[in-house]
Amino acid sequence: MGLLVLVLVLATGLFYWFLPASVAVPFVVQRARGVVLDDLSGTVWNGRAGRVMTQEGLELGAATWTLGRDVILGRTHLDIHLDGRAGRFDGHMDRTEADRVQWRDVDFRLDAAALASPGLPRELVPVGVVEGKVPQADLQGNWPVTLDADVAWRAAAVKTPEGHVTLGGIAFKASSAGGVLHATLKDDGEGSLAVDARVAASPLGWRMEGALVPRIADTALTHLIARFGPVRPDGSVSLARKAGLAPAVSP
């Protein structure tokens, strides 16, 4: 009986150490939202997914990853690389506490459609390429306690039921220190819409200032920006709004 127990323990240990990705990943994916992994190979520690798709069926490409074995002790150290028709993504993630996640050296270039929020109306289709670098992001309870992000939406456009709206280039910059987030969103002057927004937020509230100002008279453009608020007599839309105990917006 003792020998049998020893054999079972050794077998369990070997199975854990060389756990096939095709066995482990489906259980992980059940907890993930918005992503489907297929054509799995390798182990859970050094694995590959030949096909990565959104739940809507958009194919992103193939992914490889390296996962630290101390995940069994509750500590996650993950390196991930995605490359395919939708673009590429690289990043390193550490999770040493239940409610704290750290991302480092995130670098991506993805089709705008691949980054579309599930809450975006289906009739609106973002076009263009989104490039970004996030050297560091420390999240506590999903809130960015520390953040440094620089993202650019290049050749930005939106397909709408009324037509194709070109937006040029749009830059998003965000930083967070001491739990207070500051972000800006601004266009490059080449598109049909002047975009200028500034945001300040904390776990207690948020504030936004800015406006959307059309550079041309266009029905599709007017319908698009009307989704963000009432259109003023000059055709613009104010983005001024706040909620809770909002911090001040930096100039």
What are the functions of these language-model segments?
Residues 35-125, 131-133:
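N-terminal beta-strand/beta-hairpin edge segment
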Residues 131-198:
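Solvent-exposed beta-strand/coil patches in large extracellular/periplasmic or lumenal scaffold regions
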Residues 21-40:
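Alpha-helical transmembrane signal-anchor/signal-peptide segments
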Residues 77, 144-148, 207:
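Outer-membrane beta-barrel architecture
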Residues 24-25, 69-73, 218-227:
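Alpha-helical membrane-targeting segments
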Residues 1-26:
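N-terminal type II signal-anchor transmembrane helix
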Residues 1-3, 15, 30, 169-251:
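Extended terminal
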Residues 84, 155-157, 214-216:
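Transmembrane beta-strands of outer-membrane beta-barrel pores
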